[in-house]
């Protein structure tokens, strides 16, 4: 069984480099995240190939639509055998409840998580889209909504994990992007933590991309990160 907290973001434009990277990694030491660009190009066959390699897959498509449409999308994701799938919490309570019902009804139910506020956002970015609350208040509101809807957890910055756990439940999962080893570039992330810092905050899963996938030796990079935990 895989007890690793690390989810590696396979942020590649096509399957060849994604599979090359995956084949250098062990499914005992990580899970893989497939995002919008790679899935849009390669679709379900890539999910099947990665699962054949033994990996559990987080399908990171952030569904956000009317409840029936999102429920249908979650059903299809479950049929692909993914380990986790997500929605945008800002889609509202009814949408998330419909998504949860669809996930629960699946033969192999995936974990269902909700994105609170993207880690590329800060208070100014929130204000620019009409959200007057500060980051922490908005994240708490959306996390509580996801918890009320019965979801398994949220995708959030490690900065918000303690308050989310306190306002929901200790077992409510927190999946945290914006994780960078010491000395790594922050790229397009505004709220960044090292893996050790994120776990100290209470994060359950750490999403790490470029520091591993762009390394000369991805397996060595992963092992180096695991050694710091």
Curated annotation (Swiss-Prot):
Entries under Pfam families matching the protein: OMPdecase
A GO cellular component annotation here is: cytosol
Query: Top-level EC class, please?
Result: lyase
Cell cycle: present as a keyword of the record? no
Q: Recorded GO terms, molecular function?
A: orotidine-5'-phosphate decarboxylase activity
Write out the residues that bind substrate. Answer: 11, 33, 60-69, 119, 180, 189, 209-210
TM spans (from-to): none
The Gene Ontology biological process annotation of the record reads: 'de novo' pyrimidine nucleobase biosynthetic process; 'de novo' UMP biosynthetic process
Q: What SUPFAM superfamilies does the record tag this protein with?
A: Ribulose-phoshate binding barrel
Q: Which PROSITE patterns match?
A: OMPDECASE
- Active site, renumbered: 62 (proton donor)
Q: What is its EC number?
A: 4.1.1.23
Q: Which InterPro entries match?
A: Aldolase_TIM, OMPdecase, OMPdecase_AS, OMPdecase_bac, OMPdeCOase_dom, RibuloseP-bd_barrel
What this protein catalyses is:
orotidine 5'-phosphate + H(+) = UMP + CO2
* Pathway given in the UniProt record: Pyrimidine metabolism; UMP biosynthesis via de novo pathway; UMP from orotate: step 2/2
List keywords of the entry alphabetically: Decarboxylase, Lyase, Pyrimidine biosynthesis
- UniProt KW DNA-binding keyword: no
Q: What is this protein for, i.e. what is its function?
A: Catalyzes the decarboxylation of orotidine 5'-monophosphate (OMP) to uridine 5'-monophosphate (UMP).
Please state which protein family the record places this protein in: Belongs to the OMP decarboxylase family. Type 1 subfamily.
Question: How is the quaternary structure described?
Answer: Homodimer.
Name of the featured protein: Orotidine 5'-phosphate decarboxylase
Organism of origin is Dichelobacter nodosus (strain VCS1703A)
In the UniProt record, the gene name given for this protein reads: pyrF
